[in-house]
Amino acid sequence: MEKSTRTLFITIVITSMLLGFGNSDLAQDREECTNQLIELSTCIPYVGGDAKAPTKDCCAGFGQVIRKSEKCVCILVRDKDDPQLGIKINATLAAHLPSACHITAPNITDCISILHLPRNSTLAKEFENLGRIEDNYNSTSPTQIHKDGTGGGKAEPVKSNGWKEKSWLGVELLIYLLVSLIFF
């Protein structure tokens, strides 16, 4: 029950964040990435620094998002400090997610061109720094993941409650749909 409540809360937070965007570019990003960002909700304990490694569900969702839209991952890292997000995201851990999940993904520095950032902007420099951190990690041997984003690890297995989790997922999706219909 605790996991279902947490997942429901995360879904509501992400939906609220996406509803809060104001200008047209952000509104377009919201529209484009809503479903993909919800698939990443299981990664929040890891990218928030509360879990040693991403879960298998997180890695599966992350892999789907990378295949569908790299831009959405870039948007999430870009907006990590947005107070409307309502959650903390450690950008180093977010950039490390492909390695932690053993997923081939473009370098985080590709976000500079994906998001059309000026090369000399603060945000572009932040993406470049994240890319260097990840390159340095990949050139060293894996160790334990720490809250500060250093080290490495393997995805943690997820215990399943069978149909109970699936029924909560249905409830969460229904709530998301209702909220979307009300506010869109």
From Swiss-Prot:
Tissue specificity as recorded in UniProt: Preferentially expressed in the shoot apical meristem and the root meristem. Also present in the ovules and developing embryos. Observed in cotyledons, hypocotyls, flowers, leaves and siliques. Up-regulated in the epidermis of stems.
Signal peptide: 1-24
Sites of GPI-anchor amidated serine lipidation: S160
SUPFAM superfamilies membership: Bifunctional inhibitor/lipid-transfer protein/seed storage 2S albumin
Propeptide, chain numbering: 161-184
GO process annotations (BP): defense response to fungus
Membrane-traversing stretches: none
Record's GO cellular component terms: nucleus; plasma membrane; side of membrane
Gene disruption phenotype: Increased susceptibility to penetration of the epidermal cell wall by the non-host mildew fungal agent Blumeria graminis f. sp. hordei (Bgh). Some early aborted seeds and infertile ovules, and increased salt permeability in seeds associated with an increase in unsubstituted fatty acids but a decrease in omega-hydroxy fatty acids in seed coats.
Key words of the record: Cell membrane, Disulfide bond, Glycoprotein, GPI-anchor, Lipoprotein, Membrane, Plant defense, Signal
Membrane-topology descriptor: Lipid-anchor; GPI-anchor
Main location: membrane
Cystine crosslinks: C33-C74, C43-C58, C59-C101, C72-C111
Region feature (Disordered): 138-158
Location relative to the cell: Cell membrane
Biological role stated in the UniProt entry: Lipid transfer protein involved in seed and ovule maturation and development, probably by regulating the fatty acids homeostasis during suberin and sporopollenin biosynthesis or deposition. Contributes to pre-invasive defense against some non-host powdery mildew pathogens by preventing the penetration of the epidermal cell wall by the fungal agents (e.g. Blumeria graminis f. sp. hordei (Bgh)).
Protein's recorded name: Non-specific lipid transfer protein GPI-anchored 6
Organism from which the protein derives: Arabidopsis thaliana (Mouse-ear cress)
